Curated annotation (Swiss-Prot):
Pfam families: IspA. The keyword Membrane applies. It is a multi-pass membrane protein. It is found in: Cell inner membrane. The chain crosses the membrane at residues 22-42, 50-70, 76-96, 121-141, 149-169. Disulfide bonds: none annotated. Plays a role in cell envelope biogenesis, maintenance of cell envelope integrity and membrane homeostasis. This is Inner membrane-spanning protein YciB. Keywords: Cell inner membrane, Cell membrane, Membrane, Transmembrane, Transmembrane helix. The lineage of its organism: Bacteria, Pseudomonadati, Pseudomonadota, Gammaproteobacteria, Enterobacterales. One of its GO terms (cellular component) is plasma membrane. Belongs to the YciB family.
Length: 179
């Protein structure tokens, strides 16, 4: 259910874009993201940091898009989020000396430090590449292509990279954890 909620604002954004325009889609995205955040609080009495950061960025960049009637702001939001994710991963590894991926999954998985570091760097690189791809597609290709890329392309890339990460993790699990 939680994973569905995470994708709900994206589905709403896409539907409103197809039915109306980028500005209606942006308004719907802000409202849907707020509703998901409120629902998460009511249902689980908890709001994840990533969800809160995403909402703030959606509200700020979406608000700027609507106020200035300029879709460039909402297009930048994707890259800014990915840059923040990549930055957090890199800072966790080089400054805090414990990769963020390990902080998130380390209680459930026993992996060598080198595996955590490689996985953390791989995700940071993934977010950097996705952010750069977003810039290219958002500002050099037609808007409808960007919307499709944002909704389907980035979602598919993230799912594929998550599966590949799972395979990488599985290969490095201790034998007793593989069963």
């Amino acid at each position: 259910m939680k994973q569905f909620l995470d994708f709900l604002p994206l589905v709403v954004f896409f539907a409103f874009y197809k039915l109306y325009d980028i500005y209606a889609a942006t308004s719907a995205l802000i409202v849907a993201t707020a509703i998901v955040l409120i629902y998460s609080w009511v249902r689980y009495r908890k709001i994840e940091k990533m969800a809160l950061i995403t909402f703030v960025l959606v509200a700020v960049f979406g608000g700027l898009t609507l106020f200035f009637h300029n879709d460039e702001f909402i297009k930048w939001k994707v890259t800014v989020i990915y840059a923040l994710f990549a930055g957090a991963l890199l800072i966790s590894q080089w400054v805090m000396k414990k990769p963020l991926i390990q902080r998130m999954l380390g209680k459930e998985l026993a992996l060598p430090q080198q595996v955590w570091s490689k996985l953390n760097l791989a995700w940071a690189l993934f977010f950097i590449v996705c952010g750069l791809a977003n810039i290219y597609i958002a500002f050099w290709l037609p808007q409808n292509i960007w919307v499709n890329f944002k909704v389907f392309g980035l979602t598919a890339l993230t799912l594929i990279f998550t599966l590949l990460s799972g395979v990488y993790i599985y290969r490095h699990l201790p034998q007793e954890d593989k069963s």
